Amino acid sequence: MESRLLDILVCPLCKGRLEFLRAQDELVCHADRLAFPVRDGIPVMLESAARPLDAPADTAHAS
């Protein structure tokens, strides 16, 4: 994920900073405790696509 993109992306709920977790391919909002998936290099910034941070990463984002 490009660092320029990370500089402008914010959490769609609280408008807070996001952290990119490369190993999980997720953008994490620590304030809302949500992880947004990155699919094929494209962040999916929908609340409905996010998983709670307390949910296991391997079962998240199943559609």
UniProtKB/Swiss-Prot annotation:
Protein origin, superkingdom: Bacteria
A Pfam cross-reference name: Trm112p
Looking up Gene3D superfamilies in the UniProt record yields: 2.20.25.10
Question: Can you name a GO cellular component term?
Answer: cytosol
The UniProt similarity line reads:
Belongs to the UPF0434 family.
Which named protein is this? UPF0434 protein BAV2101
Q: Which HAMAP family match?
A: UPF0434
